[in-house]
Amino acid sequence: MINAPRVCVQVQSFYVESQSEPDEERFVFAYTITVRNLGRHEVQLLGRYWLITNGNGRQTEVQGEGVVGEQPIIHPGSEFQYTSGAVIETPLGTMEGHYHMTDHQGKAFQVSIPVFRLAIPSLIH
């Protein structure tokens, strides 16, 4: 059994009304992600994979190196936080995915990003 480093991911999403155009089926959402290293050694975030699903069930996959132009090294007991965004065609959707990371010995591992909702405030009860 391989012991992957302990990394926690927390997400908060919000609707960006000022950049959205509902009449044109353009709904802009931002999300802030905090990646915490709960382990005893540093880890590095090298890339990400996203599965974005709109309210009609249409899915888009996005993958790439780093996050917001960085490949941060996260030291034990510390965190890396960033804000990014997504544009979908419906007022409701979801995102989920994973990060590609390496441990202090250069061994690759993945950290899941739990599914989170993209929703305009009037849809949340």
Curated annotation (Swiss-Prot):
PROSITE patterns associated with the record: APAG
GO biological process, one term: error-free translesion synthesis
Coiled coil: none
Domain ApaG: residue ranges: 1-125
One Pfam family of this chain: DUF525
Transmembrane segments: none
PANTHER family hit by this protein: F-BOX ONLY PROTEIN 3 (PTHR14289), POLYMERASE DELTA-INTERACTING PROTEIN 2 (PTHR14289:SF16)
Protein name (database record): Protein ApaG
